[in-house]
């Protein structure tokens, strides 16, 4: 069993919901990102999504877009992100999932890209702009390497499409809670409970809910609705960006612990 699936299997046996925080690599700097990964692992993260800064992030809201812009302005590239993973992954228990748009994969070539991220210690991959219809090559190549490609289900997806995505997704299924981009919201999308119930009819794979979860109370609600994982991005990135890097890391640790407590 590969790392992401194994993590969920262990959590299910204990009756626990996974916490998956997201960070943008290189914001505010690479050293702080490395330390943030260690802190999140220590503070209760079960898996960690690490975003590769990209100049045209279609799925990202203003907080993560701004973080990506800051990282790009400092010259952060894929190889820098992988250097962080290589440095940190053996020190932490949480598997690292790389979040990247498809263009860097296309530019390097699927096999070269996957070989590089596997060698660095990445365990999973999320590609938000990869259509289901074009996912087979990447799914086959990740499976060959013991990596897991996590596919996204949109709230607007038909039941037939939800079924098709869930069948192909590796590790877990990423359920997008709202239409639109990522970002901090005051309440979780009202359709999430029904979406989760619908997904449960078509798959027994773990389901993670993301986009818009920003408060412990929201995380607790999503768990109560039956999610196997809560994914928190913009609210994490926002806290890390506030104040000095030291202050940001302290805020990140506190927030991560609060979220983990809420879903435990």
From Swiss-Prot:
One of its GO terms (molecular function) is tryptophan synthase activity. It catalyses: (1S,2R)-1-C-(indol-3-yl)glycerol 3-phosphate + L-serine = D-glyceraldehyde 3-phosphate + L-tryptophan + H2O. The keyword S-adenosyl-L-methionine does not apply. Its EC number is 4.2.1.20. The active site is at 49 (proton acceptor), 60 (proton acceptor). Gene3D superfamilies: Aldolase class I (3.20.20.70). Pathway: Amino-acid biosynthesis; L-tryptophan biosynthesis; L-tryptophan from chorismate: step 5/5. One of its GO terms (biological process) is L-tryptophan biosynthetic process. The keyword Amino-acid biosynthesis applies. It is an enzyme of class 4 (lyase). Pfam families: Trp_syntA. CDD domains: Tryptophan_synthase_alpha. GO terms for cellular component: cytosol. Keywords: Amino-acid biosynthesis, Aromatic amino acid biosynthesis, Lyase, Tryptophan biosynthesis. NCBIfam families: trpA. The alpha subunit is responsible for the aldol cleavage of indoleglycerol phosphate to indole and glyceraldehyde 3-phosphate. Belongs to the TrpA family. Tetramer of two alpha and two beta chains. This is Tryptophan synthase alpha chain.
């Amino acid at each position: 069993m590969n790392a992401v699936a194994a993590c969920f299997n262990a959590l299910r046996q204990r009756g626990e919901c996974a916490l998956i925080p997201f960070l943008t690599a290189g914001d505010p700097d690479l050293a702080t990102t490395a330390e943030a990964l260690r802190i999140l692992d220590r503070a209760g993260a079960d898996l960690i999504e690490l975003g590769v800064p990209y100049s045209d992030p279609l799925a990202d809201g203003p907080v993560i877009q701004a973080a990506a812009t800051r990282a790009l302005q400092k010259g952060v590239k894929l190889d820098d992100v992988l250097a962080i993973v290589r440095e940190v992954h053996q020190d932490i228990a949480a598997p690292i999932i790389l979040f990247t748009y498809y263009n860097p994969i296309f530019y390097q070539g699927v096999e070269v890209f996957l070989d590089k991220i596997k060698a660095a210690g990445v365990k999973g991959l999320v590609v938000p702009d990869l259509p289901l219809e074009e996912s087979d090559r990447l799914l086959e190549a990740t499976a060959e390497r013991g990596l897991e490609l996590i596919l996204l289900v949109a709230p607007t997806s038909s039941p037939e499409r939800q079924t098709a995505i869930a069948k192909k997704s590796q590790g877990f299924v990423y359920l997008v809670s709202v239409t639109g981009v990522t970002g901090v919201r005051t309440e979780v999308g009202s359709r999430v409970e029904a979406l989760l119930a619908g997904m449960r009819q078509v798959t027994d794979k773990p389901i993670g809910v993301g986009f818009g979860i920003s408060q412990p109370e929201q995380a607790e609600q999503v768990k109560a609705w039956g999610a196997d994982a809560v994914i928190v991005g913009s609210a994490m990135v926002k806290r890390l960006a506030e104040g000095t890097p030291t202050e940001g890391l302290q805020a990140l640790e506190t927030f991560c612990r609060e979220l983990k407590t809420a879903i435990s």
